[in-house]
Amino acid sequence: MAIFHQLPDSVLQLLAVFLSIIIEALPFVLLGSILSGFIEVFVTPEKVQDFLPKNKVLAILFGTLVGFIFPSCECGIVPIITRFLEKKVPSYTAIPFMATAPIINPVVLFATYTAFGNSWYYVLLRFVGAFLIAMILGILLGFVVDDQILKDNRKASHVHDYSGLSAGKRVFQALVHAVDEFFDTGRYLIFGSLVAASMQTYLPTRILTTIGHNSVTAILIMMLLAFILSLCSEADAFIGASLLSSFGVAPTVAFLISGPMVDIKNLIMMKHQFKTRFVGLFVGTASLVTIIYCLLLGVI
C-alpha cells in the first residue's frame, strides 16, 4: 500500500473517480447484459412482430413511452437495444426507447422529484424534453434516413432455435449469452470511465462555471459537464439540483436531459455497435433538440 502514498494527489483523485464511476455503472451493465441474454433466448422475431404496432407513428410512440414500464439505466441500454435490433425490432422503435428509458422510468423520475425538493416541475420538464428528442429520432429513422444502424462488420450473435430446450437449459443459455455480453460491453465501459475520470480530474468544473455567463453558453457548458461526469441517470438529478443556483433552470434541465443520452461511456459503447453515421445523427439530434428546448424554457 506504500506505493499509493508516493502517487501524486491528482492520480489518486483520478483513481477514486474512476472506481466510483465503475462501481456506480457496473450493476446496471450487468443487469442490461442479463436482460439481453434472456431476450436472445426467450424472444423470437415472430413474437416481436406480433407485439409491435403496425403503424409507424404508433410504433415510434410505443418505443418512446415503453421505458416507463420497462426501465433501464443508460449504462446497460446499448446491449439491450442491440439485441432488440437483432430480433428485428425496427430502429424507429428501438432508438426512441434507448433515448427515453434511462429518463422516464419511475425510479429516475422519483429521484428527480426528490432531488429538487419534491417538485414535479423539473420532473415534467425532463420528461417532455426526453419525449421530444425520442419522437424526433423515431421520425427521422422511420421516414427520412436509413434505418439500418447496426455495424455491418460487427460481431453479431448467431441465430439459434432454443424452443426445443427445457426451461432450465434455456435459462442456462441466457446466462451464457449474458456473460459474453457483459465482458464485451464491460471493456468499453472501463475505457469510457477512465476517460471520464481523467477529464473530471484535469478539467476543473470551476473553469466551466466561470465561462457559462449567457444562456446559450450556460446550456452548452452543462451539456458538456453531463458528458464529462457520465453519471447514471438514477444519480444525476442530485448533482443537477446542486448546480441549479449557479446556472439556472434551463441549463440544469439540459444537464438532466443530455447526460443519460450522451455521455462518454455510453458514446463509446454505441460506437462499438452502431454505424458512425447513426451515432452522429443520434448525438447531433439529441444535442440540437436539447439546446432549442432549453432556450425556449429560458424565454418562457
What is each PLM-predicted segment?
Residues 35-66, 207-213, 239-240:
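Membrane-embedded helical hairpins/re-entrant loop segments and their flanking transmembrane helices
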Residues 24, 28-31, 40, 44-45, ...:
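Short helix-loop boundary/capping segments at the starts of domains
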Residues 38-43, 202, 264-265:
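Structural signal for the C-terminal ends of transmembrane alpha-helices
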Residues 69-128, 204-274, 278:
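Membrane-interfacial helix-loop connectors
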Residues 24-25, 63-68, 228:
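Interfacial helix-start motif at the membrane-water boundary
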Residues 1-34, 46, 50, 124-223, ...:
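Selected transmembrane alpha-helices and immediately adjacent juxtamembrane segments
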